[in-house]
Amino acid sequence: MSPTGACGWRSRAARGVPSSPDAPDKEALAAGDVVSALFPIHVPGGREQQGFRPAVVVGIPERLGVPRFEVIVVVPMTTDRGQQWSERSPALYPHLEKGTANLRSPSICLLDQVRSIGAERVRGYRGTLDAEQYRPIHDGLRKMMSYDGEDVPEQTTESAG
């Protein structure tokens, strides 16, 4: 298999990055890496995931330019306990098996909670998804964010101004 997948994914080995689970080299993180991250506690509480949990890196702002702050874009995960909501919407909630990228339990990727976090919130590297494991996450985000060109507002002369 080629080290670069159809969605631009490259394994850590292909990038020359060691696979140490110790403190991650935040400079070397890339889409498809699974990290342990500390998500902020929200006051007042909402529906967002919070606390210490695994997350999949899905975006590196430095690919577009120099960001104001050192952040990464991630999809938080939760433990798969056979929740019906995830079974009803598998494209929105891709599942990963126990052991995938060193996950301790079967997990659900919460695409509806994609967000930026400060790089200092990344507390450890767990592993890297292969292209087949990352594909449902990539495709789901692409469709959800209308990256395929669907649902993009047409420019009118009023809005062009």
Regions found by a protein language model. Give the residues of each.
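Conserved functional hotspots at enzyme active or ligand-binding sites that engage polyanionic ligands
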Residues: 1-161
